[in-house]
């Protein structure tokens, strides 16, 4: 069978930027929709960022949400992508090593150990889907749990993601059978963090729609 480490990487790409290997760093329609929503709400309500833009933001720029920073972000992405300063494969590798997966948890390897006491290549499919779902709102991961189990609304989320993975040939329909959020068991150091924070807030945070 294929290595689940590969499925893990592909699921993250499907979640964050499915067209990463095919675009030049920008998705004009996503940027346009983001700007329209930001103007309507008079705040930075929607990202519209490609994986390339997220990488540049995390490596080169501050996290401040300003128009000037967004323009700087787009300029650096254009320079990197248009001049082919590095490969897409290398960009994705760096992204996996620096992306945030929880409060002060950075990189896929650290995150896998933090939540499951495993290396990324050892994760099962249910764990891969959970890990990919964290990236859009890493600081809100505690709100996804009742105790140490994912909240019931993850059922629909998993169904959508599994259907997408099967449709795109990333997994077989047989591999999707029995993959549910109920099978996700937090066994790493995150167990202590989640236990300590569960009683602090009743806030709910549903998984984001995947790109």
Where are these regions (language model features)?
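A short, charged, and often flexible helix/loop element on the N-terminal side
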Residues: 62-68
């Amino acid at each position: 069978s294929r290595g689940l480490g590969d499925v893990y990487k592909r699921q993250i790409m499907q979640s964050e930027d499915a067209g990463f290997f095919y675009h030049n760093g920008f998705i004009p329609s996503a940027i346009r929709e983001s700007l329209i929503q930001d103007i309507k709400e008079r705040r930075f309500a929607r990202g519209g960022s490609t994986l390339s833009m997220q990488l540049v933001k995390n490596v080169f720029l501050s996290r401040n949400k300003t128009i000037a920073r967004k323009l700087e972000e787009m300029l650096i992405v254009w320079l990197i992508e248009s001049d082919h300063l590095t490969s897409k494969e290398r960009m994705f590798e760096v992204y996996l090593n620096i992306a945030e997966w929880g409060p002060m948890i950075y990189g896929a390897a650290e995150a896998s150990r933090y939540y499951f006491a495993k290396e990324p290549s050892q994760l099962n499919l249910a764990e891969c889907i959970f890990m990919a779902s964290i990236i859009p709102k890493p600081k809100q991961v505690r709100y996804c749990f009742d105790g140490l189990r994912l909240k019931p609304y993850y059922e629909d989320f998993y169904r959508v993601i599994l259907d997408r993975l099967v449709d795109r040939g990333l997994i077989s329909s047989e591999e999707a059978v029995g993959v549910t959020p109920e099978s996700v068991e937090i066994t790493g150091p995150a167990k202590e963090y989640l236990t300590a924070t569960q009683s602090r807030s009743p806030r709910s945070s549903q998984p984001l729609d995947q790109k």
